[in-house]
Amino acid sequence: MLKDKKILITSGRTKENIDPIRYLSNNSSGKMGYCLAQAAIDLGGEVTLISGPTNLEIPKGLKNFISVESALEMYERVNEFFEDTDIFIACAAVADYRPKEYKKEKIKKSDSDLIIELVRNPDILFEMGKKKDNQLLVGFAAETNDIKENALKKLEKKNLDIIVANNASTMGTDSNTVEIIKKDKSSVEIKQKNKMELAYDIFSEVISVLKKGKNE
């Protein structure tokens, strides 16, 4: 199945600190990424999991777990492992922006509005798509509208082999409905399965792409 394959997975959310008390983040639980890591281990893969903050237990049998907090930290660690990776699955909910300036002391409340200037974080998957050699890249598109249309745009723009499209409202839940879309635009819709089952379904498509590549 995935024997001798090196699989790099990102999961969880990122935290972008504003001051020692406040930060920017999102509602991602990290469940999907952790389920993917567990499925990859069960299928014989050599897995590295780079995770932002979660409340989850580390997958059984995982040998390489890397904890990060910010998007920049995650970007640096992905860069570190990407070259020696066969399959990269970007499942983390990474902040698009971070505060331009971190305040070392708590920002005090005042009578005026607080304006925080934000700057863009690196687009990890886009950057890896540019660096891609023989790696198979899998991305996720959590959208609120025009789900498939937006997923197809990401698939092409980020040079992906597979994208998993779903409704952003399912973030943090135990189950999901997704559409798995391949580079050739063929797709499989999977309705309302728990995330562990979905993880195996996603790897089924990954394995089919790997097999197709060998036969070409």
Placement of each model-derived feature along the sequence:
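A cross-family phosphate/adenosyl-ligand binding-site feature
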Residues: 1-216
